[in-house]
Structures are given as C-alpha cells and as structure tokens.
Amino acid sequence: MMEVESSYSDFISCDRTGRRNAVPDIQGDSEAVSVRKLAGDMGELALEGAEGQAEGSTPDKEASSQPESSDANTSS
C-alpha cells in the first residue's frame, strides 16, 4: 500500500496535468525546427504515402487472385 501512496504523491506533486500517461513536456530549443521546414516535410510524407499505396495495392490484387485460382483447381 505504501508503494501506491508514494507513486500517487509523486504524480500529484509534478506539474503535469491531464492523463496520467501523457507525454511529458519536451525541453529544448524549440526554434531548431521552423514551421516552413515542418510543412515541407509533411508535404513529402503525403506524397510518399500516396505513391506507396498505389504501388502496394497492385500486388495485393494479384496475390488475392492467386489463392482463388488455386482453390478452384483443388475443388475441381
């Protein structure tokens, strides 16, 4: 019971609010990343994701058609 009480008092004494398992505040130089650079990086991620989905969907269709044809061969 003492273990629970000590962790509770540690949590209450800290300056964090909200959910108990929330991410703590990030300390450091916040000026190191500019909004312009972040927006550019986000744009690149969106483009890479769209390309990856287009390429990734083609093999899935081929893979799904292969088991169907093999199932048809086994039931004949």
From Swiss-Prot:
One of its GO terms (biological process) is negative regulation of protein import into nucleus. The keyword Transmembrane does not apply. Residues 1-25, 43-76 are annotated as: Disordered. Residues 1-10, 64-76 have a biased composition (Polar residues). Keywords: Protein kinase inhibitor. Residues 43-56 have a biased composition (Low complexity). It comes from the Eukaryota. The keyword Protein biosynthesis does not apply. GO terms for molecular function: cAMP-dependent protein kinase inhibitor activity. Extremely potent competitive inhibitor of cAMP-dependent protein kinase activity, this protein interacts with the catalytic subunit of the enzyme after the cAMP-induced dissociation of its regulatory chains. Belongs to the PKI family. This is cAMP-dependent protein kinase inhibitor gamma. It comes from Mus musculus. The gene is Pkig.
